[in-house]
């Protein structure tokens, strides 16, 4: 086919969508170019045969940044791209979340989306271009998809308001970084971090983005009108209404009773028994439904039971109403040898969170398309299988763990002190020890507590809460502090983190159309009420950061020297600074402006290194008395070392008031003596006296 090109204006940017020239064997392929600056190739391939045995929709999204896109060669021995970076993993999730709910229910054909950044500058993030390309590639592929979607990034400044698709430079000066995606009628996904913005400002950003990305949706529709392949002849399986009614008649009441059991393990055990009974009764013999079909229908009965109870005003699974937060149990300082720790328990969700302080050298080195940079703050989230009472894979972090860790990081990052105030590298690790809903928000609360326990001067405590939604027709219920089952069976996962003053992070995933501005306002209002409740209970345990660091934390001393003295501290080939580090067991970082940070495992080690540096950089003061060591004796006097690397001359006439025939009559090499600095000439030569020390002391020097 001949290439089809569609160009449109998106805010201040010109976007071009092209198909039919590259990757023509893919089911759908679109090359997206933004301002002749960022180019992303997006391909979609759909399997023709379904894979119903998997039990879930097999969609995979792979976002990859090629280093050649920025004119770079990969580092490392192999000199080629390796496993996905954290940025690539997070962007893959960002693209997956808004498109997944738009595939029809029951569609089980494998779909793979690959977004490849093939050209980019260092001005803007290519993720929005990749999301636009994904929407376009799906729209022309013929695969059943209820799109297209649009996407936009929003920044916010108090003076200028909202800004569409900002550059990296503009984002750095912004108090908001938000990505929004959705269809023409509804918002489906929000990912953001903010600096204590109000709920109204956050909602305004969502609505602003939705209005602005209508241009994307219209352009994709126009491209599809010219270049789309025929829509697949796919129809969902016909529902077995008779079997559904039979199982519900037999087990519906028991399922409803099962969902009144508040303890998760007991509830799961009872529902498992009922499920096994249903499978035994309605499947097995030839001509009867399969066990998987009965299991699927049983799951549908569970789904409807929980939802109907909630929208009809009945108590939730654990007996709460829609606005109540589960009971909290909060402890800090739970681990004796760590720098800061907290155990945060909310109902059956529990996080053990540990904060560790390190030196500037411990910062994470990131090799991105924009170049290398150091990250002094890390937040890692671990979700072991025992947290849900299961056996499972142990190993490196998966996509979910990386995503939850980044959300928790975004939530607390704005409240961390500036590097010049607190120049430590900070690592927070959240170990989820129990999970029944919203472990990421438990990590936020635990991280704030652990950081304050470690003595990190937080600007304000941070708490997070997960909201849910059940909507049936015109009826809906917004749920505060959702359980795992409510997350799975509900229509929305809406996480809000912030301080008492404002929002620091908002993440929203919506599974249905029809989420109105009113529903989002109610959710934000309930989230604020819950957040303030949690913060109040956290503040009763630890309301502000400890004034002193843990005795186990490294001691940091900051100082500044004259830039002319830097080479003296470093020494030839680094010999001097290396010797100081080896002898004191401290680590030393020197900046070009003379700023020095000394880190020691103990206060004594850091102080010893500081004194060594002061000794090297100190200048002899005229009129000051020093205790020096005789280094060398000559006929006309003695050279005395008064500071590291600084010797002065005591002339023979300055040794004593009495006449001295030989210097060795008064001094010997290695002897310690008190000397007075008489003068320092313009060549740095120091003139000393021993005989004038007594008079100087008498005068109060």
Curated annotation (Swiss-Prot):
Keywords: Cytoplasm, Magnesium, Metal-binding, Nucleotidyltransferase, RNA-binding, Transferase. InterPro entries: ExoRNase_PH_dom1, ExoRNase_PH_dom2, ExoRNase_PH_dom2_sf, KH_dom, KH_dom_type_1, KH_dom_type_1_sf, NA-bd_OB-fold, PNPase. Residues 554-613 form the KH domain. Its cofactor is Mg(2+). It is found in: Cytoplasm. Its EC number is 2.7.7.8. GO terms for molecular function: 3'-5'-RNA exonuclease activity; magnesium ion binding; polyribonucleotide nucleotidyltransferase activity; RNA binding. Residues 623-691 form the S1 motif domain. Mg(2+) binds at residues 487, 493. It catalyses: RNA(n+1) + phosphate = RNA(n) + a ribonucleoside 5'-diphosphate. GO terms for cellular component: cytosol. Pfam families: KH_1, PNPase, RNase_PH, RNase_PH_C, S1. CDD domains: KH-I_PNPase (cd02393), RNase_PH_PNPase_1 (cd11363), RNase_PH_PNPase_2 (cd11364), S1_PNPase (cd04472). One of its GO terms (biological process) is RNA processing. Belongs to the polyribonucleotide nucleotidyltransferase family. Component of the RNA degradosome, which is a multiprotein complex involved in RNA processing and mRNA degradation. Involved in mRNA degradation. Catalyzes the phosphorolysis of single-stranded polyribonucleotides processively in the 3'- to 5'-direction. This is Polyribonucleotide nucleotidyltransferase. It comes from Pseudomonas putida (strain GB-1).
